[in-house]
């Protein structure tokens, strides 16, 4: 648990998996749902999280206000989030207030700040893939599974 008593992803694991030193490869903000990769390989985690390797992280999000094609263009080109211009990204509009964004960096509250830069607000955010591995749609929130052989191969090809 965290200092404020909140449950962490490690708290959700069986005791035998906690003992082998698993840790999250990256993080999700408190109100963000979705895919978290757990590993006990520090070199792999460092590689996947290093901005120079441009590992893709894909998020589904919903906004308070409709998203325009101008918003999409601005987000894709990079926006100022407090003195930092975000790297180019991909945005797929899938509804008036719904989209999927693919980032290759992971600044603190980045998507929320990016949407604020185009005068909008994130009301729901979920990571749906990391390093070309997609969230298993059959998993319930708070549950986990081992990677498949093909998913391990994806990571080995990158690493």
Can you say where each PLM-predicted feature lies in the sequence?
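Basic, flexible Lys/Arg- and Gly-enriched helix-loop patches that mediate nucleic-acid binding at interfaces
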Residues: 1-159
């Amino acid at each position: 648990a965290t200092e404020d008593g909140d449950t962490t992803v490690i708290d959700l694991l069986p005791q035998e998996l906690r003992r082998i030193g698993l840790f999250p490869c990256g993080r999700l903000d408190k109100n963000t749902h979705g895919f978290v990769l757990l590993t006990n390989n520090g070199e792999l985690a460092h590689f996947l999280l290093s901005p120079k390797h441009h590992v893709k992280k894909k998020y589904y999000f919903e906004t308070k206000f409709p998203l325009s094609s101008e918003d999409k263009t601005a987000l894709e080109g990079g926006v100022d989030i407090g003195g930092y211009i975000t790297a180019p990204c991909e945005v797929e509009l899938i509804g008036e207030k719904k989209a999927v964004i693919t980032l290759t960096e992971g600044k603190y509250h980045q998507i929320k700040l990016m949407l604020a830069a185009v005068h909008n607000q994130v009301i729901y955010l979920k990571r749906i893939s990391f390093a070309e591995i997609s969230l298993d749609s059959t998993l319930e929130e708070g549950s986990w599974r081992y990677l498949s052989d093909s998913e391990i191969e994806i990571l080995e090809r990158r690493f």
